[in-house]
């Protein structure tokens, strides 16, 4: 099979490498770039654990071919922490005990990040539930995840 020359920016770093045309974006990120924060749960795009941002939009990396990301910008959960400081969403997830095993957490965080970055978006408990409705957690139920989401947006909106 012929390799495809992939050029992609991942977490601010440009990578140019050959990939098999059938290689999934999740596998490229985890195995080729060693970014293991992106988790693969269902391998069908249903659970949301593999969510990353592709040109600022959440996508299920287990259903996207790496070649589809050519000349694009990708953000993974590893991009959230800056200079040793957790992103406000990560702080709220920790503060509100919104994780147990942590397998799904990166997917929730990357689903919420574009909403958090849009200062025109505010979330209450109802809209937070809707925002995360495409992500599945098998451990916590969802109350703590909703509380963490509302807390992060409240802190952002009130400069806490």
Swiss-Prot record:
Cofactor binding note: Binds 2 [2Fe-2S] clusters.
Enzyme Commission number: 1.5.99.14
Function: Molybdo-flavoprotein enzyme complex involved in nicotine degradation. The subunit gamma (large subunit) contains the substrate-binding sites, the subunit alpha (medium subunit) binds FAD and the subunit beta (small subunit) has a 2Fe-2S ferredoxin-type domain which binds 2 2Fe-2S clusters.
Catalytic activity: 6-hydroxypseudooxynicotine + A + H2O = 2,6-dihydroxypseudooxynicotine + AH2
Tree of life domain: Bacteria
GO molecular function: 2 iron, 2 sulfur cluster binding; 6-hydroxypseudooxynicotine dehydrogenase activity; metal ion binding
Name of one Pfam family that matches: Fer2
Required cofactor(s): [2Fe-2S] cluster
UniProt: [2Fe-2S] cluster 2 binding residues: 101, 104, 137, 139
Domain 2Fe-2S ferredoxin-type: 4-80
Entry keyword annotation includes Translocase: no
Enzyme class: oxidoreductase
GO process annotations (BP): nicotine catabolic process
Description of how the protein assembles with itself and partners: Heterohexamer of 2 alpha (kdhA), 2 beta (kdhB) and 2 gamma (kdhC) subunit. Dimer of heterotrimers.
Pathway linked to the protein: Alkaloid degradation; nicotine degradation
Protein name (record): 6-hydroxypseudooxynicotine dehydrogenase complex subunit beta
Annotated [2Fe-2S] cluster 1 binding sites: 42, 47, 50, 62
The keyword Zinc appears for this protein: no
Signal peptide residue numbers: none
Alphabetized UniProt keyword annotations: 2Fe-2S, Iron, Iron-sulfur, Metal-binding, Oxidoreductase, Plasmid
């Amino acid at each position: 099979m012929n390799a495809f020359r992939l050029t992609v920016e991942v977490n601010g770093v440009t990578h140019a490498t050959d990939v098999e045309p059938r290689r999934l974006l999740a596998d490229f990120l985890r195995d080729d770039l060693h970014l293991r924060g992106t988790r693969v749960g269902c391998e069908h795009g249903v659970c949301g654990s593999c969510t990353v941002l592709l040109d600022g939009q959440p996508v299920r990396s287990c259903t996207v071919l790496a070649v589809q990301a050519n000349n694009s910008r990708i953000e993974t959960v590893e991009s959230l922490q800056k200079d040793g400081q957790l992103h406000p969403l990560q702080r709220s997830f920790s503060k509100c005990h919104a994780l147990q095993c942590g397998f799904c957490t990166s997917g929730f965080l990357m689903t919420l990040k574009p909403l958090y970055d849009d200062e025109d978006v505010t979330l209450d408990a109802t809209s937070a539930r809707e925002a995360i409705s495409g992500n599945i957690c098998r451990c916590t139920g969802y109350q703590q995840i909703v509380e963490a989401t509302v807390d992060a947006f409240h802190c952002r909106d009130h400069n806490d």
